[in-house]
A protein has these predicted regions:
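Catalytic cores of DNA base-excision repair glycosylases
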Residues: 28-254
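Polybasic, lysine-enriched low-complexity intrinsically disordered terminal tails
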Residues: 1-27
């Protein structure tokens, strides 16, 4: 399976404050929960659930991969990740490297001048807080506690924390939301028109069954993301070819 693009908001300049955490979400309206399930059931046959995981990185490596991928084509972030792996024997060596050297190594991604020091700072924070560059201990935590631990690090947002838990070998039941997933959910009316990507995470997770497995949530993210890439485009969505058209208020306006 081709590796899809994974996007998050652009990194904040160094020293900028993180946005405040979203308040805990109340139970969703029954009609929205039912609609979220209907969307899942309609899209799964189209995109082939269960969807294979696209790689199996340790959680620290997944953290680096996710930080590289922000607003960057997957092919470009993938090349940058491989370049870092080839240049540095371990992530400790990356932390110790000169910033301009790291920036040059990841030059193919967007904002390498921001991402190079950001990745080094995030890794240094992990090492300081965890006593080493190993996040395996997150497997013993509840998902929300693990996400809170990660998001306490400046530069790590909801999408990155969910990606580390879901996409890495931890395989924990967290729901990432990228820009494609977010756009489809917004057009379907699952989230409001002013709800940004970050705050949408707890809302969309609350609409899905609490007992869903890591694979179920991974599938939900993947099918909505793929649908956003292939059908529900940012411009000129292909509503006439959309299996969700009958339950999508935006399709009736197209």
């Amino acid at each position: 399976m081709a590796v899809p693009h994974r996007h998050e908001a652009p990194p904040r300049p160094r020293g900028a404050k993180a946005a405040p955490e979203a308040a805990p979400q109340a139970a969703p309206a029954p009609d929205l929960a039912a609609k979220a399930l209907a969307v899942h059931r309609l899209l799964c046959p189209v995109y082939g659930c269960p969807i294979p995981y696209f790689h199996a990185l340790d959680p620290v490596s997944e953290l680096v991969s996710s930080l590289l991928s922000h607003r960057t084509r997957n092919a470009d972030s993938g090349r940058a990740f491989k370049a870092l792996r080839a240049r540095y024997p371990d992530w400790a060596a990356l932390i110790a490297a000169p910033v301009p050297e790291v920036e040059a190594t990841i030059a193919g991604v967007t904002w390498p001048e921001l991402k190079a020091p950001r990745i080094q700072a995030v890794l240094a924070a992990v090492r300081e807080r965890a006593g080493g560059l190993d996040l395996g201990f997150l497997a013993g935590m509840e998902v929300e506690a693990a996400r809170a631990w990660l998001e306490a690090i400046p530069g790590v947002g909801p999408k990155t924390s969910a990606a580390v838990l879901s996409f890495s070998v931890l395989r924990m039941p967290a729901l990432p939301v990228d820009s494609h997933h977010h756009r489809v959910a917004q057009r379907l009316g699952l989230i409001g028109p002013r709800v940004d990507v970050g705050p949408s995470h707890p809302i969309l997770r609350a609409q899905l069954p609490a007992d869903w497995s890591a694979q179920d949530l991974y599938d939900n993210h993947e099918i909505l993301m793929l649908h956003g890439q292939r059908v529900c485009h940012h411009r000129n969505p292909a509503c006439g070819a959309c299996v969700l058209a009958e339950i999508c208020p935006s399709a009736r306006l197209a």
